[in-house]
């Protein structure tokens, strides 16, 4: 009798994806973040579901319903903070996952990479809409500022913004539709993840050396299942440490004040994981230019396969490109810091320089250094 995992139509798919999948024998812990992102998505969907059972998407009661969850619902505070900090863990894993892809040349699997970029945009949209739901000060003003950016689109901008708002300002209609979208998008993300995995399993995973690993594959289970479980335990440890010891560490105190359209907070800023893009947006004095730079700061990932001029796929044996990669990382951290600062000297100029450096490294220096390293190979 054939093993059920190899014959059953449904279990067979799972078997080929997670059990008998041939995996390179030398992939490091940087390859753990895919499974961690899957775990984060699962945590977010579950905690979100339980929050939705008690939340009301109405301007009059949204803020007090979140308060009610934290005070009156059994372990409501735990579910709420796991959901809020789970988003932070999600983005930490996302940034590390994308960084791994850039460092080891995973972007050469173009279909997988492009679906990944679509996933990134979808997750960012979901997180933004989720931040609006508690209806605190930063929720309201964040929603107002970010949706208002669409008014920079020539001719149709203002109409588009009012269409998204469902009125002439961010109000009840906006909150209700944001809740609807915030609920449905994670399931769309889950479907996109399936497509992401489908494309990945067409080629198999890359590996740190960047060379073909067909000659040396090992089964995913038990080798990488046990490795993923270790990663998952560390993720849960970090998440629960954050939730139980300092749940508001990454949040904004302004969001504990109910939304008031008549009082603007002194510094409107998004959650920490959007600050780098927010800093790039603010560094351009023109509204439309800023919006374009904001979108391009992430969309630029799509042109990495075109900028691959090196004869080696991975950066493992390319010290000059490695230096640039870590300068880019430092630059992104600088942008994240600047995004959280007020718009005044010297932060404005630092933000502008960091933004110029961000695009210069990707568009000019990385391809240039790749060609230089190709020359060095001939010596």
From Swiss-Prot:
Domain of life: Eukaryota
Sequence positions that bind heme b b562: 83, 182
Alphabetical UniProt keywords: Electron transport, Heme, Iron, Membrane, Metal-binding, Mitochondrion, Mitochondrion inner membrane, Respiratory chain, Transmembrane, Transmembrane helix, Transport, Ubiquinone
Any Gene Ontology biological process: mitochondrial electron transport, ubiquinol to cytochrome c
Keyword Electron transport: yes
Principal location listed in the UniProt entry: mitochondrion
Bilayer topology: Multi-pass membrane protein
Residues bound to heme b b566: 97, 196
Binding site for a ubiquinone: 201
Entry's Gene Ontology cellular component terms: mitochondrial inner membrane; respiratory chain complex III
Further facts: Heme 1 (or BL or b562) is low-potential and absorbs at about 562 nm, and heme 2 (or BH or b566) is high-potential and absorbs at about 566 nm.
Subunit structure: The cytochrome bc1 complex contains 11 subunits: 3 respiratory subunits (MT-CYB, CYC1 and UQCRFS1), 2 core proteins (UQCRC1 and UQCRC2) and 6 low-molecular weight proteins (UQCRH/QCR6, UQCRB/QCR7, UQCRQ/QCR8, UQCR10/QCR9, UQCR11/QCR10 and a cleavage product of UQCRFS1). This cytochrome bc1 complex then forms a dimer.
Entry function: Component of the ubiquinol-cytochrome c reductase complex (complex III or cytochrome b-c1 complex) that is part of the mitochondrial respiratory chain. The b-c1 complex mediates electron transfer from ubiquinol to cytochrome c. Contributes to the generation of a proton gradient across the mitochondrial membrane that is then used for ATP synthesis.
Protein name: Cytochrome b
UniProt organism field: Graphiurus murinus (African pygmy dormouse)
Biological classification of the source: Eukaryota, Metazoa, Chordata, Craniata, Vertebrata
């Amino acid at each position: 009798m054939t093993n059920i995992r190899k014959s059953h139509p449904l279990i067979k798919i799972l078997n080929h994806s997670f059990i008998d999948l041939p995996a390179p024998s030398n992939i490091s812990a940087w390859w753990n973040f895919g499974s961690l992102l899957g775990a984060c998505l699962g945590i977010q969907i579950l905690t979100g579901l339980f929050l939705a059972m008690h939340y009301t998407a109405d301007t009059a009661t949204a803020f007090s319903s979140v308060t009610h969850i934290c005070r009156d619902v059994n372990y409501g505070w735990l579910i709420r903070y796991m959901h809020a900090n789970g988003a932070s863990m999600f983005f930490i894993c996302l940034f590390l996952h994308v960084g791994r892809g850039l460092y080891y040349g995973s972007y050469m699997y173009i279909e997988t990479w492009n679906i990944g970029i679509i996933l990134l945009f979808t997750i960012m949209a979901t997180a933004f809409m989720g931040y609006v739901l508690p209806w605190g000060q930063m929720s309201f003003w964040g929603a107002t500022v970010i949706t208002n950016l669409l008014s920079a689109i020539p001719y149709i901008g203002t109409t588009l913004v009012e269409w998204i708002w469902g009125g002439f300002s961010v109000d009840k209609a906006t909150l209700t539709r944001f809740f609807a979208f915030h609920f449905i998008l994670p399931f769309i993300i889950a479907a996109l993840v399936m497509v992401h995995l489908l494309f990945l399993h067409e080629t198999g995973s890359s590996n740190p050396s960047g060379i073909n690993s067909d000659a040396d594959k090992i089964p995913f289970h038990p080798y990488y299942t046990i490795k993923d479980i270790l990663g998952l335990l560390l993720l849960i440890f970090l998440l629960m440490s954050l939730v139980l010891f300092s749940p508001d560490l990454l949040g904004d105190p302004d969001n504990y004040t109910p939304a008031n359209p008549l009082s603007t907070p002194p510094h409107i800023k998004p959650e920490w994981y959007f600050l780098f893009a927010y800093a790039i947006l603010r560094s351009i004095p023109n509204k439309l230019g800023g919006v374009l730079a904001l979108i391009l700061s992430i969309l630029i990932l799509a042109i990495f396969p075109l900028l691959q001029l090196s004869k080696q796929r991975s950066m493992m044996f390319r010290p000059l490109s490695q230096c640039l990669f870590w300068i880019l990382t430092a630059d992104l951290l600088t942008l994240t810091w600047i995004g959280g600062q007020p718009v005044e000297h010297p932060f404005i100029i630092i933000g502008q320089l960091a933004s110029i450096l961000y695009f210069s490294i990707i568009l000019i220096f990385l391809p240039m250094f790749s060609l230089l390293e190709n020359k060095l190979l001939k010596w």
